[in-house]
Amino acid sequence: MWQIVFLTFGCDLVLASAYNNFRKSVDSTGRRQYQVQNGPCSYTFLLPETDSCRSSSSPYMSNAVQRDAPLDYDDSVQRLQVLENILENNTQWLMKLENYIQDNMKKEMVEIQQNVVQNQTAVMIEIGTSLLNQTAAQTRKLTDVEAQVLNQTTRLELQLLQHSISTNKLEKQILDQTSEINKLQDKNSFLEKKVLDMEDKHSVQLQSMKEQKDQLQVLVSKQSSVIDELEKKLVTATVNNSVLQKQQHDLMETVNSLLTMMSSPDYKSSVAVPKEEKTTFRDCAEIFKSGLTTSGIYTLTFPNSTEEVKAYCDMDMGGGGWTVIQHREDGSVDFQRTWKEYKEGFGSPLGEYWLGNEFVSQLTSGHRYVLKIQLKDWEGSEAHSLYEHFYLSGEESNYRIHLTGLTGTAGKISSISQPGSDFSTKDSDNDKCICKCSQMLTGGWWFDACGPSNLNGQYYPQKQNTNKFNGIKWYYWKGSGYSLKATTMMIRPADF
């Protein structure tokens, strides 16, 4: 009886079109193998050998078997047929099994494919969602980056605009500075030319001064000879003075005799009554004390002389008795005058005038006088400077001014240089500067080295009175460039 010892089969999960293949072989143990191939599935059958069957290694030949045992051959044929029938049945069964497996595998494959598709769909959806989230995140990041870029771009544009504006301003400033530099260069060239002209002029002046020096040296030598002659005359005059003293003594005796004779009653009756002498005044203080207390023009007499001068007397200011020696108020009188004019005086006592250096010198040299300087600016303010002691030296000392004891509201420091300065005019330069202050600053004054004051300078009207070097100035009240509106210089005895 044939028995199926072992059956193996294998099928791929993926089914293809079926095909049949049958192969017979013998393994190493001598057992027969039958392999059936149906599509992707293969089936192997291992059948045992019967006892009557000999191996192919038997020493006798098959023809001998057939010849010696004919009955065994028929049995073998029958058995083979049975076996083939069994094999055919098994093959059919296997085909059915294969069909069943194929049908089931199709369903399973469809399910597997559906599951795979579902899983893949879920994965794809998850991946898509993740990609969408990542895309949204990236989009947000890109939006933020874009906003930052826009902000940075806007900031850069604003900075660029500011830099452009700054550049334009700098260019304008550079152009203005270039223009200013060009102007300064032109002005510098003009000033250089002017300096060269001044140097030439100064050279000419120095040459002229050298010539004047030579002339002065000649004059000094002449004066030395004159002085020698004068000394001789002085000796002669001294001798004559003794004679004069004797004559004076004789005259005094004669006068005393005449006085004795005039005092006798007989002489008084025989001599007619003389006329009343004319009253004279040396200054306005004497006029005020005489009972004349109205401000106005009065006649004053030089000390020890009959020479007279008209002067304005201020009987109202500070107790009255003031003799006005200078007055400025409207620029109607030109104060750029000569030495002689300042010596004798000029102008009108009712307006602008200068009383005269000679009269003031003689008046103040023998008595102690007070000097008051009254000042008025263009804004309506007034100030004054009061000197407790004032006098002028004689013409031989160039009418040098002497002042002490300053008080008042026009500055704590005197604007008239101290110690005393000599008087200078346009034709008599007695200052301490080689520039001739009277010609440069105009007017006659005690300039010293063109000092801090000049009340006889050029008169400038309102709105033209600032930044004027040659105006009517009083430095320690209004500075050197301010020209005053009105000034008055007046004197009065210190014991008034």
From Swiss-Prot:
Carbohydrate attachment residues: N89, N119, N133, N151, N240, N304
SMART domains, A to Z: FBG (SM00186)
Signal peptide: 1-18
Gene3D superfamilies noted in UniProt: Gamma Fibrinogen, chain A, domain 1, Gamma-fibrinogen Carboxyl Terminal Fragment, domain 2
Cysteines engaged in disulfide bonds, as pairs: C284-C313, C433-C435, C437-C450
GO biological process: one example: response to glucose
Coiled-coil stretches: 159-256
UniProt KW Disulfide bond keyword: yes
Fibrinogen C-terminal domain sequence ranges: 280-496
UniProt GO molecular function: metal ion binding; receptor ligand activity; receptor tyrosine kinase binding
CDD domains recorded: FReD (cd00087)
Keywords: Angiogenesis, Calcium, Coiled coil, Developmental protein, Differentiation, Disulfide bond, Glycoprotein, Metal-binding, Secreted, Signal
Annotated residues for binding of Ca(2+): D429, D431, C433, C435
InterPro entries for this protein: FIB_ANG-like, Fibrinogen-like_C, Fibrinogen_a/b/g_C_1, Fibrinogen_a/b/g_C_dom, Fibrinogen_CS
Compartment list: Secreted
PANTHER family (alphabetical): FIBRINOGEN ALPHA CHAIN (PTHR47221:SF6)
Free-text note on domains in this protein's UniProt record: The Fibrinogen C-terminal domain mediates interaction with the TEK/TIE2 receptor.
Function description: Binds to TEK/TIE2, competing for the ANGPT1 binding site, and modulating ANGPT1 signaling. Can induce tyrosine phosphorylation of TEK/TIE2 in the absence of ANGPT1. In the absence of angiogenic inducers, such as VEGF, ANGPT2-mediated loosening of cell-matrix contacts may induce endothelial cell apoptosis with consequent vascular regression. In concert with VEGF, it may facilitate endothelial cell migration and proliferation, thus serving as a permissive angiogenic signal. Involved in the regulation of lymphangiogenesis.
Self-association and partners: Interacts with TEK/TIE2, competing for the same binding site as ANGPT1. Interacts with ITGA5. Interacts with SVEP1/polydom. Interacts with THBD; this interaction significantly inhibits the generation of activated PC and TAFIa/CPB2 by the thrombin/thrombomodulin complex.
Name of this chain's protein: Angiopoietin-2
